[in-house]
A protein has these predicted regions:
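Polar-ligand-bearing catalytic/cofactor-coordination segments
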Residues: 1-110, 124-125, 129-181
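Small-residue-enriched core segments of transmembrane alpha-helices in multipass membrane transport
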Residues: 110-122
Length: 181
């Protein structure tokens, strides 16, 4: 029954998969997971044995629907592009600042090894500045995947129980501090 329901879910999402597979996780962790893995014609659904053993079929279905939401919305590509742009922007700003610092005579040249700690300081500060933006974008993507899961399955109670159980089982912080978030 599980295999048929998960295959039907992937078909409704217009996502071709090679099949549904179980992954042995219980010998290494108590965490549970279900995922869409692979690219193109190698794409497949993988469900951890820890999830198969402890979750209802409805709960597994909504977890996979969430993962399919990421696929349908091309979230991996969006994250790769956005993180690359942030990194390039950060390196560009660091380059401008390093050139200004060298021009001011604080360092002999850009190739001076003494500029390396300053460069690391700049990248650390830049990371702290963009982290809230990056985290906000990640949260948006997660909310959209949640919404997709709910719209594609209409199983609100199963979604709530699965997400609560996953958070507890995987030791996630259910309500993180606004500073962390």
């Amino acid at each position: 029954e599980l295999t048929q329901r998960l295959l039907a879910l992937t078909q409704r999402a217009n996502t071709k998969v090679r099949g549904i597979y179980s992954m042995q996780m219980s010998n290494k962790t108590t965490a549970a997971n279900a995922a869409l893995m692979g690219l193109g014609n190698t794409r497949r659904v993988v469900v951890g044995d820890t999830m198969i053993d402890r979750y209802t079929v409805d709960e597994i279905e909504v977890v996979l629907a969430h993962e399919l939401g990421h696929h349908v919305h091309s979230d991996i590509w969006k994250l790769i592009i956005s993180q690359s742009l942030l990194m390039l922007g950060g390196l560009y700003v660091a380059n401008l600042i390093l050139h200004a610092v060298v021009a001011a005579g604080l360092y002999r040249s850009l190739t001076d090894a003494a500029t390396l700690p300053f460069f690391f300081l700049l990248t650390g500060v830049f990371s702290l500045i963009v982290m809230p933006i990056s985290n906000s974008y990640s949260r948006l993507i997660e909310y959209q995947a949640d919404e997709y899961a709910l719209q594609s399955t209409h199983k609100v109670e199963s979604f709530k129980s699965a997400m609560t159980r996953l958070a507890n089982q995987n030791l996630a912080e259910i309500e993180p501090s606004p500073v962390v978030e």
